[in-house]
Amino acid sequence: MIPVINQEKQGISGDFRLSVAPMMNWTDRYCRVFHRVLAPSARLYTEMVHAKAVIYGDRERLLGFASVEQPVALQLGGSEPALLAKAARIAVDWGYSEINLNCGCPSDRVQAGSFGARLMREPALVADCVAAMAAVVSVPVTVKCRLGVNEDDDYGRFAKFVDWVSRASSSRMIVVHARNAWLQGLSPKENREIPPLRYDWVYRLKRERPELAVVLNGGITSVEAGLDHLLMVDGVMLGRAAYQDPYILHQFDCALSNAPLLPRALLLRALRPYVEVWLEQGLTLRHIVRHLFGLFHGQPGGRVFRQVLTQGGQRSDADWSLVEQALSIIEDQETYAAVV
């Protein structure tokens, strides 16, 4: 059993002001517990999991999570209403508090499976998928989408897509990555950077449809920018910034709750009970420490902290003492800075 650090602000709620985007190869269960330590009120999302994998795959590996992660949402991939409904029902049985349908991933592999961003061209099908899931679960069923695909420059088409989706589910929530998705010519990484951001479209959507809960994603790299967006929309979803500089999650969470900031080292040490349980279960440290690399981003000693974890984490016998070794470098730097 995974120990619980602090459940005071846990539980399933309708607060979508801060969330962490579903990111393939990043937001696994170990990353999500770390993010929960940093941001007690944030909504967390899994990596995308295809509906067929949920139905036929290793559910413990794909769906297992610690109770402290709540509220946590499962992001599903797929385009077959019946399969998505079956997968959603399984996910709710596993305790997920939200089901999110991926309509934004532009990768070739996802396109070959006829889901992800290409679904934005089929709003009626997306509505059928959402309705099928909403009919069999009691938790919110939401969608994460782009503004359009390829050279679409039609706000009306985007708004129509949202209308189709929102009418299919009682949750009335949409997550929008404020860029188009290019289905040819760009890699997934380039698709997160090259298509221009159009925050004005997302603001307009919220202004014209005030009954919708609109969450904005894309290009948010600071707490200040996120708070500015919250003047216009209901929530912000952080992606790469939350992984590359995870302390931003703590800063944002504290800004929303008017709580004092805690030192990075204190937050990291709060993760120790979880790490020790995972190690006892046979996990190697390298699967965990890769999510910690950015915690001291831009801080004195931050680069060496990462190097120690990277190199030492490869050892099969590495344990929490490696993290303490890396932290000692940071604390030595802080002591030196205080003296001089």
From Swiss-Prot:
Keywords per UniProt: Flavoprotein, FMN, NADP, Oxidoreductase, RNA-binding, tRNA processing, tRNA-binding
PROSITE patterns: UPF0034 (PS01136)
The enzyme's E.C. designation: 1.3.1.-, 1.3.1.91
Active site: C105 (proton donor)
Record-marked site positions (Interacts with tRNA): N102, K189, R192, R303, R306
Catalytic reaction equation(s): 5,6-dihydrouridine(20) in tRNA + NADP(+) = uridine(20) in tRNA + NADPH + H(+); 5,6-dihydrouridine(20) in tRNA + NAD(+) = uridine(20) in tRNA + NADH + H(+); 5,6-dihydrouridine(20a) in tRNA + NADP(+) = uridine(20a) in tRNA + NADPH + H(+); 5,6-dihydrouridine(20a) in tRNA + NAD(+) = uridine(20a) in tRNA + NADH + H(+)
Residues involved in FMN binding: P22, M23, M24, Q75, K144, H177, N217, G218, G219, G239, R240
Pfam families, sorted: Dus (PF01207)
Entries under InterPro entries matching the protein: Aldolase_TIM, DUS-like_FMN-bd, DUS_fam, DusA, tRNA_hU_synthase_CS
Cofactors required: FMN
A molecular function (GO) term: tRNA binding
HAMAP family associated with the record: DusA_subfam
Family: Belongs to the Dus family. DusA subfamily.
Annotated function: Catalyzes the synthesis of 5,6-dihydrouridine (D), a modified base found in the D-loop of most tRNAs, via the reduction of the C5-C6 double bond in target uridines. Specifically modifies U20 and U20a in tRNAs.
Name of the protein this chain belongs to: tRNA-dihydrouridine(20/20a) synthase
